[in-house]
Amino acid sequence: IISSVMANDLSFTPNVTTEFRYFPESPAYDGQFEYFQPSIYFGGEGRWVSKDRKKRVRFEPFLRLDLQDDERTHFDIRELSYLQRFNDFDLLIGNAQIFWGVAESRNVVDVINQFDEVENSDETDKLGQPLFRFGKFTDIGRFEIYYLPYFRERTFPGKDGRQRGPLIDDLDN
């Protein structure tokens, strides 16, 4: 049972989407499916913020069911994190997507999260990364220290997937 104090600051926005990809060209490699790729996405965003706004919990589940590419059918917790703010520093613990990187001429190179290649090859979809983050505000800016307890493997399309290259990535072996 959620108390009325907590319920006032608790929200969840579900998202269910059907997707139909159409590829007008014939497959480039043997084993790829033909022209249509239907799938269903289930996800959402849950948030809880304390009344003093010093505590926050975020939850973003992700489930894709693809009818043709088994590697694209997957579940991930993109975010399940707890943030505690103190006077001039904060602590983030959990699974999170961090938008932080090094600027290059073309774009920002993300150095924390792996990209979810089975979703898109444009490097916009990220996998959640287990981490601890300590952040401190100073007069000259903000400083952050990250601890990543382990490395998430990048995901790739399977042999049936249309957005794969000539070599098949077999990460199961």
Question: Could you tell me what each predicted segment is?
Answer:
Residues 20-39:
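Surface-exposed strand-loop-strand hairpins of Gram-negative outer-membrane beta-barrel proteins
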Residues 8-26, 55-59:
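Transmembrane beta-strand segments of Gram-negative outer membrane beta-barrel proteins
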Residues 41-46:
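Histidine-anchored nucleotide/phosphate-binding helix
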Residues 1-9, 160:
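Cleavable N-terminal export/targeting peptides
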Residues 162-173:
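Surface-exposed beta-loop-beta
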Residues 47-163:
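Outer membrane beta-barrel
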